[in-house]
Amino acid sequence: MPKLSLLKQDGTNAGEITLNDTVFGIEPNEKVVVDVILSQRASLRQGTHKVKNRSEVRGGGRKPWRQKGTGRARQGSIRSPQWRGGGVVFGPTPRSYAYKLPKKVRRLAIKSILSSKVNEEKLVVLEGLTFDAPKTKEFATFLKNISVDTKALIVVAGESENVELSARNLQGITVIPAESISVLEVAKHDKLIITKAAVEKVEEVLA
């Protein structure tokens, strides 16, 4: 089972924590991780694109000229696709790009990316993380204490308003509750900082 140092908020050592082998110690499956990232990114697409076809473009109800005798090609409407200002053929319509992968695949992906962070020594476990009031300066000091100077995802147990507000103005720092942890969020950040209570919640769901 993976063992990591447990850090206090001031960066000092608070002992060790043993992580669950089935969540943080599996052989990472990169293919599954990529599949889930693509699925989650697809779900974020708006899909509100829309063009008008010939029946939706305003006007064009009258036949431009008579069928025969003019020497010109026959035309039924000035809103036909071949006309300037006409409707679009097979253009984009509103749709959802979302698709779901099996639950087993999604679980394997989150376990794989968590195990990757452990293998790459990019997982930091905190004894706890609390702030009496929203203070960006204090949060920046906390990051300095634990030697984090890159994009970091901070996972806490439940909602923590002061922590979220303190980190809001810091570029590259995202705070989420343990229930919202996702493959895409973990992949977007270089380091994963997680509290001991959040580790227990994640293990409870995934183990």
UniProtKB/Swiss-Prot annotation:
Biased composition (Basic residues): 60-71
Record keywords: Ribonucleoprotein, Ribosomal protein, RNA-binding, rRNA-binding
InterPro entries per UniProt: Ribosomal_uL4 (IPR002136), Ribosomal_uL4-like (IPR013005), Ribosomal_uL4_dom_sf (IPR023574)
UniProt superkingdom: Bacteria
A GO cellular component annotation in the UniProt record: ribonucleoprotein complex
Gene Ontology terms describing biological process: translation
Stretches for region Disordered: 47-78
Pfam families found in the cross-reference section: Ribosomal_L4 (PF00573)
Keyword set includes RNA-binding: yes
GO MF, one annotated term: rRNA binding
Subunit organization: Part of the 50S ribosomal subunit.
Family of the protein in this entry: Belongs to the universal ribosomal protein uL4 family.
Protein role: One of the primary rRNA binding proteins, this protein initially binds near the 5'-end of the 23S rRNA. It is important during the early stages of 50S assembly. It makes multiple contacts with different domains of the 23S rRNA in the assembled 50S subunit and ribosome. Forms part of the polypeptide exit tunnel.
Protein name, entry field: Large ribosomal subunit protein uL4
Organism: Listeria welshimeri serovar 6b (strain ATCC 35897 / DSM 20650 / CCUG 15529 / CIP 8149 / NCTC 11857 / SLCC 5334 / V8)
